[in-house]
Amino acid sequence: MQLWVGLGNPGAKYAGNRHNIGWMAVDRVAEDHGFAPWRAKFQGEVSEGVLDGEKVLLLKPTTFMNLSGQSVGEAMRFYKLDSTDVTVWHDEIDLAPAKIRVKAGGGHAGHNGLRSIHQHIGPHYDRVRLGVGHPGHKDRVPGYVLSDFAKADAGWLDDVLRGVSDGAPHLARGDGGKFLNAVALRVAPPRSSTSKPKAQDNREDAAQAAEERSETRTPPEARPEDTRSALQKLADKFR
């Protein structure tokens, strides 16, 4: 079994916060992949399901962010899991919005939710780092992550959540590369194979315009042959 933990704060007040993007991600996975209804357990809410043959328990701690480790530790001990069976989904201010990275182990980088998890299960767990951008100064970080996403963020946020849901089976199998590819296909879909680079379009447009000008240009009219004698030409000149 794998334990996937979505970090966030409980309550409607925090539901749309940047700090709650981890909750949003596991909610989307549960909804799209037919997981069981959420139920209260382990100082949080849990939902069980299967992703490509892998049993996964989703957990949303309701302890508030700074005590998330209590919930994670309790669930891990109950199922006799190792910390390497745990994947934590969390907001990441050091990544631009819509950027995602998968990481195995490491520090908590000042993230209070990760700090709490470190204290209860150690640092050797996996993370899905969900970029939300940085406010520009460290003093503004608390207010920034505890604020709702802007309306302008709705498009990329929906793409990211769809992408992580698409890629969830790959992540469950341990293929982080395919997981990230699935996200990328939602966030930055490839150009159509029939589309042409802009420069090529411009060159073709210019060539076509030149061809059209050439076709529509009226050639000069031919002058009739002058059959007059020299005497007639001289007489006509002085008329």
Swiss-Prot record:
Residue ranges that the Swiss-Prot or TrEMBL entry lists as coiled coil: none
Residues at the catalytic site: H19 (proton acceptor)
Keywords associated with the record: Cytoplasm, Hydrolase, RNA-binding, tRNA-binding
Keyword RNA-binding among UniProt keywords: yes
Classification via Gene3D superfamilies: Peptidyl-tRNA hydrolase
Record GO biological process: protein quality control for misfolded or incompletely synthesized proteins; rescue of stalled ribosome
Catalytic activities: an N-acyl-L-alpha-aminoacyl-tRNA + H2O = an N-acyl-L-amino acid + a tRNA + H(+)
InterPro entries attached to this UniProt entry: Pept_tRNA_hydro, Pept_tRNA_hydro_CS, Pept_tRNA_hydro_sf
Site (Stabilizes the basic form of H active site to accept a proton): D91
CDD domains: PTH
Subunit structure: Monomer.
Region (Disordered): 188-239
EC number(s) reported in the record: 3.1.1.29
Entry's family note: Belongs to the PTH family.
Protein name as it appears in the record: Peptidyl-tRNA hydrolase
Amino-acid positions noted as binding tRNA in the UniProt annotation, renumbered to this chain: Y14, F64, N66, N112
GO molecular function, one term: tRNA binding
Function description: Hydrolyzes ribosome-free peptidyl-tRNAs (with 1 or more amino acids incorporated), which drop off the ribosome during protein synthesis, or as a result of ribosome stalling. Catalyzes the release of premature peptidyl moieties from peptidyl-tRNA molecules trapped in stalled 50S ribosomal subunits, and thus maintains levels of free tRNAs and 50S ribosomes.
Domain of life: Bacteria
One cellular component (GO) term of this entry: cytoplasm
EC supergroup of this enzyme: hydrolase
UniProt key word Transmembrane helix: no
Site-annotated residues for Discriminates between blocked and unblocked aminoacyl-tRNA: N9
Biased composition annotated in UniProt, kind: Basic and acidic residues: 198-239
Predominant location category: cytoplasm
Location in or out of the cell: Cytoplasm
